[in-house]
Amino acid sequence: MKLALKIDVDTYRGTRQGAPRLVDILKARNAGASFLFSLGPDHTGRAITRVFRAGFLRKVRRTSVLEHYGIKTLLYGTLLPAPDIGRECAGIMRDVRDAGFEVGIHAWDHVLWQDNVARADAQW
């Protein structure tokens, strides 16, 4: 049996800190993966509007949001300016590719995409 591992990297912190760590872990285990990166602004803080959606608070309680994302990430696009992931982390993305992993685009603005994809028409 073969398994495929797809890693969505949606935040500035995830690109700068998480992706290189995952590369090291995967290389040590001779495992492959496809990394899909968000390339535009990290607007993670704008996800706060999801607090009004059913199930969101349950998810927040179940996962350690602050620990996983960090306070700065949770403020990007609201109280802190959104860093441009693609511009500031292009070298890291190339490093992931050069380490032998497949690299692709997940979204431009992950929060914008996630909040609009369900009601998008074909032209979108």
Regions found by a protein language model. Give the residues of each.
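Catalytic alpha-helical scaffold of carbohydrate-active enzymes acting on polysaccharides/glycoconjugates
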Residues: M1-W124
